[in-house]
Amino acid sequence: ICSGLVGSEMCIRDSLNTGPNVNPAKATAMAQAAEEVGFESVWTVDHVVIPQDYKSAYPYSQSRRLGDGTENIDLPDPLIYMAYLAAATTKIRLATGILIVPQRSPVVTAKQLGTLDYMSGGRIDLGIGVGWLEEEFQAIGVPFEKRGKRTDECISAMRALWKDDIAEFHGDLINFGPVFCRPQPINKTIPIIVGGHSKAAAIRAGRIGDGFFPARGSVSYTHLTLPTTRLV
């Protein structure tokens, strides 16, 4: 996970992916053990549904299928999962890796994350992505087109809700305000790490993110990608 994008250093942090672990006792033990041995954060994944038949190509596997064809797996809601782990831990950071932001209302998502950050003592990191599974968007009832632009507006809208005493946002796709949204995050913001494998993702990270999460590739690939984040 790369942060400090406007500087000259890359920071790779010790993090643990929770995977499809929905056994309450095992999930608690995993998070507590990670905290005890010094992991900085645990990361959840996000898919609301996996359509049984889909033509979209999964970009992170040679099979082009999620889970190499084993799509029928537990993928818990990441924010509820993080809330559960927050209650079982005291200092480890809790992150989404990643949250498919354009599938969700930015106002509701900002409220959920603001509440979770406030009640966990400021331990939330928001990894975000634009999504790749068009059929999932169709099932949810959200347009797949313009998801990049929608993601950009969602991030700006959520930042306003977290920071401003009275927030409003007026974009092409997102429009609201003036509104109160309490509680706000402890630090009036939540770190946003942009995930993805494309040049567009790297540019988005440099333009509106606080970090970059290259979703695939070697360390050498990451070193090649990072300069792109600094072009904006």
Residue ranges with predicted function:
Residues 13-15, 94-97:
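Short beta-strands and strand-loop turn motifs
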Residues 52-54, 64-67, 81-83, 92, ...:
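Internal, glycine-rich beta/alpha segment that forms the wall or movable "lid"
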Residues 1-12, 223-232:
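Single conserved hydrophobic/aromatic residue that forms the stacking wall/gate
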Residues 8-88, 190:
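N-terminal beta1-alpha1-beta2 module of alpha/beta enzyme domains
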